[in-house]
A protein has these predicted regions:
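N-terminal low-complexity segments enriched in Gly/Pro/Tyr/Ser
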Residues: 4-190
Length: 190
């Protein structure tokens, strides 16, 4: 599981400590559909979502809103914090350039992760070192100070990418809102 521990002294001290964007992007790549991604993201057993923005001591449901402009997709991860207010948590950007090369990245909301918190895929066969000190994965985490570099990675083989660019793709519009959630979702304690 990828959940974070509140007791960890290396946390950023921001609400984003409770949702590791590296784990979210990894889950997104492995998902077959947007609905599958949304469901997996919100299941307690995956251990990824531990956000409690409405401060009710229960993990909030993260809804995935799809926006498309030609060959570019934006998947907005949102939490309904009240009946009248939603909070964007992060956005996943998937785009195809004129040479048909597909890129993917996730950008954390500045209020939750700080300014310019961007996770991009890294071309490597081993897990990338995470810059999020709240990350609790199976491997030991090292925080390394290094100049930021941008690496474009071809991600055509990811199941979710094959799905959104297939002729069978239909945009997903989740019907959920504050107080109304899917039957598989059970708000668990943080």
């Amino acid at each position: 599981a990828f959940s974070q521990s509140v007791a960890d002294s290396t946390l950023l001290g921001l609400p984003g400590d409770n949702l590791d964007l590296y784990a979210v992007l990894d889950l997104f790549q492995k998902s077959k559909t947007i609905e599958d991604f949304e469901k997996s993201l919100n299941l307690e057993k995956t251990g990824i979502n531990n956000m409690d923005l409405d401060l009710d001591k229960k993990v909030d449901f993260i809804k995935v809103v799809t926006k498309q402009e030609k060959d570019d997709f934006t998947f907005v991860l949102q939490i309904a914090v009240s009946e009248k207010e939603t909070q964007d948590v992060a956005v996943i950007l998937v785009s195809k350039d004129e040479k048909k090369k597909i890129t993917m990245q996730i950008v954390g909301d500045k209020d939750l992760y700080g300014k310019d918190y961007i996770v991009e895929l890294k071309e490597t066969s081993t897990p990338a070192v995470t810059a999020n000190p709240g990350y609790k994965g199976p491997d030991t985490v090292k925080v390394v100070s290094a100049p930021a570099t941008t690496t474009t990675v071809i991600v055509e083989q990811a199941p979710i990418v094959q799905y959104v660019y297939s002729p069978a793709y239909a945009p997903y519009y989740p019907p959920y809102y504050y107080g109304y959630y899917p039957p598989y979702y059970a708000a668990f304690s943080v």
